[in-house]
């Protein structure tokens, strides 16, 4: 279906642009950092790379994930005009960003970046009460709120 809504089309193009850029970063990561595909582990290792590695490629990947998610939230808002879902989807995007900032700047544990699902284990099991872990706790709270509200409104 073709839409005449200029903002919807603009946000859709932005979303496609950011997702293509994010996919390009994944391609570069797979062939530059991993030296080729690793039989299904590269997507998990890519998220470890995004959330815990410091560098230009990982920062660009995190920002394109965040911007792509926010533009997708704006596309959904322009389709349904539901303010609650806009706020909840924005919280989900901010949760990704806060977790990335925590992992890059404030995570002080042993970084097992080459193990798949490391980013999930840190998100679920890391218990820390330092100032930097405030970002982790806010990310958890926003992510859980996002899941609950997404399930309620579906």
PLM region spans:
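Short membrane-interface loop/juxtamembrane segments of multi-pass integral membrane proteins
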Residues: 40-52, 114-132
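Short alpha-helical packing/oligomerization segments
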Residues: 76-113
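Short, strongly hydrophobic alpha-helical membrane anchors
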Residues: 1-8
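Alpha-helical transmembrane segments of polytopic membrane proteins
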Residues: 10-17, 54-56, 84-95
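N-terminal signal-anchor/start-transfer transmembrane helix
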Residues: 9-37
């Amino acid at each position: 279906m073709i839409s005449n809504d200029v903002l919807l089309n603009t946000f859709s193009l932005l979303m496609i642009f950011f997702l293509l850029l994010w996919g390009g970063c994944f391609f570069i990561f797979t062939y530059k950092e991993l030296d080729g595909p690793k039989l299904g582990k590269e997507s998990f290792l890519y998220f470890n790379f995004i959330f815990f590695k410091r560098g230009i490629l990982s920062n660009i990947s995190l920002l394109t994930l965040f911007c792509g998610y926010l533009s997708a939230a704006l596309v959904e808002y322009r389709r349904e005009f539901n303010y609650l879902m806009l706020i909840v989807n924005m919280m989900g995007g901010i949760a990704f960003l806060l977790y990335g900032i925590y992992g890059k700047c404030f995570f002080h544990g042993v970084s097992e970046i080459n193990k798949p699902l490391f980013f999930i284990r840190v998100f679920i099991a890391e218990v820390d009460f330092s100032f930097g872990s405030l970002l982790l706790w806010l990310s958890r709270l926003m992510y859980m709120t996002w899941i609950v509200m997404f399930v309620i409104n579906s």
